[in-house]
Each structure stands twice: as C-alpha cells, then as structure tokens.
Curated annotation (Swiss-Prot):
Catalytic activity annotation: N(6)-[(R)-S(8)-aminomethyldihydrolipoyl]-L-lysyl-[protein] + (6S)-5,6,7,8-tetrahydrofolate = N(6)-[(R)-dihydrolipoyl]-L-lysyl-[protein] + (6R)-5,10-methylene-5,6,7,8-tetrahydrofolate + NH4(+)
InterPro entries linked to this entry: GCS_T, GCS_T_bac, GCST_C, GCV_T_N, GcvT/YgfZ/DmdA, GcvT/YgfZ_C, TrmE/GcvT_dom1
Organism expressing this protein natively: Thermococcus gammatolerans (strain DSM 15229 / JCM 11827 / EJ3)
Protein name (Swiss-Prot/TrEMBL): Probable aminomethyltransferase
Top-level EC class: transferase
Amino acid sequence: MVKRVHIFDWHKEHAKKVEEFAGWEMPIWYSSIKEEHLAVRNGVGIFDVSHMGEFIFRGKDALEFLQYVTTNDISKPPAISGTYTLVLNERGAVKDETLVFNLGNDTYMMVCDSDAFEKLEAWFNAIKRGIEKFGSIDLEIENKTYDMAMFSVQGPKARDLAKDLFGIDINDLWWFQAKEVELDGIKMLLSRSGYTGENGWEVYFEDKNPYHPNPEKRGRPEKALHVWERILEEGEKYGIKPAGLGARDTLRLEAGYTLYGNETKELQLLSTDIDEVTPLQANLDFAIFWDKEFIGKEALLKQKERGLGRKMVHFKMVDRGIPREGYKVLANGEVIGEVTSGTLSPLLGIGIGIAFVKEEYAKPGLEIEVEIRGKPKRAVTVSPPFYDPKKYGAFREE
C-alpha cells in the first residue's frame, strides 16, 4: 500500500506533479524544479519531508545500543543536539545515513531515509533480541515515522524567517543543534540542518495522519496543516516557495551530497560489478569514530588494508550533455566506473554528477569522459560543492 504524509491532500491540490517515491506518494514539483531550486539558492523554500523515518530510543541502555549500531560518537553532543552517523551491516556496507538527536533523559531520536526505516526497524529489533538472549536490556524502540511531521525550510532567507516565526537566530545554533520552540501554541523541535547545502532549519512534531496504517491513529492533521500554511504565510515577504522532491534532489547534488540508494546502499551498484558501498568508498569516513566498537568496523579495517577498489568522485561536464544514473565513465578509452547521480545544474546550467570509479581516478582535476547516448563526452573531476561557496551555500560571504 502506498504511503502518504500528513498533509498529502494539500500537496495533491497544489503540486503539478505527484508520484511515488520510495513507497511514498509525494510532491515532485509545484511550479517547476528550476524555479523551486533557484528560490532555495537565492531566497527560501519549504519542503515537506514527513516521509523521512523517525525512531525514538528510550532507556538507560539506549546510548550504549546506539553507539554499537552506528559509526559516529553520539555520546559527546549535549542535549538537545544531533550527530550525523551511519548504520552499517556486518560487511561494512551502508544500511543508511542518519541523524541521531540526544533529547536528554536517556532518550534519543533517529532520523533516517524514507526507504530505509522499515528495514532498520527490523534490524534494530533483531539486534535487541540477540542481546536479550544473554541478559536484560533497558531499551524501548518506537517507530514514529507515520506520527511525526517534518518540514524543512532552506535558503539564505530561512534565517530571517526563523526570527519572525520563533524569535531565534539559527546562526546561534551549531549545525545539527536543536531547540524546543513553539508556534501558535504548537510545540516542536527545531534543528539547524538540511539537505540542500544552504543555511536552514527543520521542525519535528507529532500530529494525526489521515493515512496512518493503523486506522485507530488516523485523524485530521490540524497542527501540520496550520504550521505549513503559517510558514508559507510568514515567508511570503521573502518570496518563499513550496518545493518538491525534484528540487531537493538537484539541490543536494549541487552541494555534492550522497543519496541513499544511489551513492550508499547495501545492494549491487547499478549494472556494474561493484560490491556493496562502504563509507570509505563514499567519502563518509568523517562520520566514523574509530575509538569504539560498532557493527561493520572489522570489515572496514580489512578494506583499508586491501584497498577500496572503487571510490566516489564528483565531476562536471566540459562538453554539452546531461549525465544520468547508470552511464559509463571512461578514461583513455577504458571503462573506469559508472554514474550514480547526474543532472543539469539549474544554477550553473551545465551537467554535473557523482560516479564510482577506480580508486586512482577518484581525485579532482582529472579529465574523464561520460558515455551519453553512446557517445563519449568530456568531463572533469572536481571537489564539491559544484557552486562557488563564497556566493552560495550555508557559509556564503554576506
């Protein structure tokens, strides 16, 4: 059965394109991908990302459990703040990229990808049952995916909008730090975070979902609809646009961010013989805290010894052409890898992409080719982001 977010009916009425993504029926665009993309880069946009998965971990053993099932050190950040961390399988492959927020009182919230929450729920519960065979564990794992509404407000004007709505300056928060806020009597958690490369914030709160799989939990999403429309109303003076998943993807690609299912996954990578993707291959080793034990650590240490084989690299087109997922990447006439994400950059007007290539080619400044419609087109490897960070992005010069 297709899944739907709390205010799906609003999206159905206002979006020009709604289609299934990762099992969820979601807005792809309202006006156009380019218009929404540029609104975020130059002003402000709002995304409904309530399809993201959320778990609550409660109990005295919650921290120790999360330290074991994720790669980063989540013991350091104080309440209320988050940590970018990975969930790996025993072979070191990425099951998902997640955020874990320390809510205080032995309680943590994990935010994960929309197409990973079901397998993660099964994974976590299986690990918990395995631990219980050898003794008791003070841990409750609750899946809040269908209950939690999540809106993402992104762009250089997102800071001004947060001041107007909540009376706070998000620049006083470090990245992934959170704060409890209230809007018209509705309490929510606000974090300085996003997936666009821009400055921004995201809010989390529970509400009724008319499409909840449990009929007893269904109801009118009065809070979610009010918050969504209130943000749009207050943001009108900044030219706010509702933005769909189409713009969210082009924005994250311009920023050079990975996408679960494309750059990180457990399955085979597209049509090549590349094995499961590890964080070392996907340049995500910054999210690994080596001074602890975690699932997949031993496999990663072995991979470091034998070599990665293939690795992720960013590239931009020199010739005209739009790279797409699955296109071959060549060097000196030899196939060296494959594109995992590609698009025409709405900001730059050129083709950009991410590929997995032989390890020796995974560095910036190399000339490569991308086979587009049977013809090799020139490209060059680069360091992300694709845009000038002095002019665009969260740390642009004001």
